[in-house]
UniProtKB/Swiss-Prot annotation:
Gene: dre2
Cofactor: [2Fe-2S] cluster; [4Fe-4S] cluster
Swiss-Prot/TrEMBL domain comment: The C-terminal domain binds 2 Fe-S clusters but is otherwise mostly in an intrinsically disordered conformation. The N-terminal domain has structural similarity with S-adenosyl-L-methionine-dependent methyltransferases, but does not bind S-adenosyl-L-methionine. It is required for correct assembly of the 2 Fe-S clusters.
Positions that bind [4Fe-4S] cluster: 276, 279, 287, 290
Binding sites annotated in the UniProt record for [2Fe-2S] cluster: 213, 225, 228, 230
N-terminal SAM-like domain: annotated segments: 20-145
Name the UniProt record assigns to this protein: Fe-S cluster assembly protein dre2
Gene Ontology biological-process entries: iron-sulfur cluster assembly
Positions with biased composition (Polar residues): 159-177
Motif (Cx2C motif 1): 276-279
Length: 313
């Protein structure tokens, strides 16, 4: 009698389909002007696979009514209408704020036709995208590499009895060269009192003081201290008062009273007269028979000659 063992599987369950993690996903952003024409959307979906493509409205995304899954899309295509620039106008900062986190590293954003202007491109750059080949890409973040800082090597354990380290006696041995400086070992250093460095003779020695508060630079004016007790402040005040009094005295030399301004000023030389004794020196010539009539007064010592009834100065 022979026994045969059946090793076949009695229940054959179907293998679940494995999801292709490398499949790229696309996001189509349509303005209301494009979404109103069904034939345009049908033409777009004939190019993209419907199973890996999502369609969202730009106005709803701008208003915050739609939330996008993070780090999902490899391509973001903004549908445009040749008759209107509504799609470009709807690409505001709020749209980029919701759109950029949903893009994978290296994902691309572009228009169906044309390219973004300067202002729209600036908003994309401020959102973290990089301009490349007429579109914008999300840069790949490089992984941070940790740096290992070199520390001090741990010392091998030594025997406290004979001072043996790895079979070699280390008692009394020293390492030649310059060792590493460890700030942790200097935490217990005591501060030195500066007064302890002075002897008794140094403490008894009087401090040198400048005589009469004379500054080092003679060109600068001497300035007293705030609480001056050496008399320099009072001396400077007296000098200032004397200087002000002298300046006021110099001004009073040419000072005229109100009554003096109303009187006629006399510019003649007192005690001296002309040859005819009719007018004094410095006065105008008024006599009808005077040969100098009508002329200004002569200067002292000026030689005057009369030739052909003409005065020659």
């Amino acid at each position: 009698m022979s026994i045969t063992i059946d090793t076949s599987v009695d229940i054959d369950l179907p293998t679940p389909p494995q999801s292709n993690g490398s499949q790229k996903r696309n996001l189509l952003l349509a303005p209301p002007s494009v979404a109103a024409h069904e034939e345009k959307l049908r033409d777009v979906f004939s190019t993209f696979d419907r199973s890996s493509t999502d369609l969202q409205m730009l106005d709803r995304l701008s208003a915050g009514f739609v939330s996008l899954p993070p780090n999902t899309y490899d391509l973001v295509l903004v549908l445009t209408d040749a008759q209107s620039d509504e799609a470009v106008r709807l690409l505001t900062r709020d749209v980029y704020t919701a759109l950029v986190p949903a893009m994978k590293a290296g994902a691309r954003l572009q228009l169906q036709q044309g390219s973004l202007g300067a202002s729209e491109g600036l908003e994309a750059i401020l959102a973290g995208l990089v301009e490349k080949d007429g579109g914008f890409e999300k840069p790949v973040q490089e992984a941070a590499v940790p740096l290992k800082l070199g520390g001090r090597k741990k010392k091998d354990k030594t025997n406290g009895v004979n001072g043996v380290q790895n079979g070699v006696a280390t008692n009394g041995a020293s390492t030649n060269g310059v060792g590493m400086f460890d700030p942790a070992q200097n935490n217990d250093d005591e501060l030195i009192d500066e007064d302890a460095l002075l002897s008794d003779d140094d403490l008894k020695r009087p401090l040198p003081r400048p005589q009469n508060c004379v500054p080092e630079t003679a060109k600068k004016r001497r300035r007293p201290c705030k609480d001056c007790t050496c008399g320099l402040a009072s001396q400077l005040e007296e000098e200032d008062r004397a200087r002000e009094a002298k300046a006021a005295q110099d001004l009073n030399i040419l000072k005229l009273n109100t009554d003096d301004l109303n009187d006629e000023l006399d510019f003649t030389v007192q005690g001296k007269t002309s040859s005819c004794n009719s007018c004094s020196l410095g006065d105008a010539f008024r006599c009808s028979s005077c040969p100098y009539i009508g002329l200004p007064p002569f200067k002292p010592g000026e030689e005057v000659k009369i030739m052909n009834d003409m005065v020659q100065l």
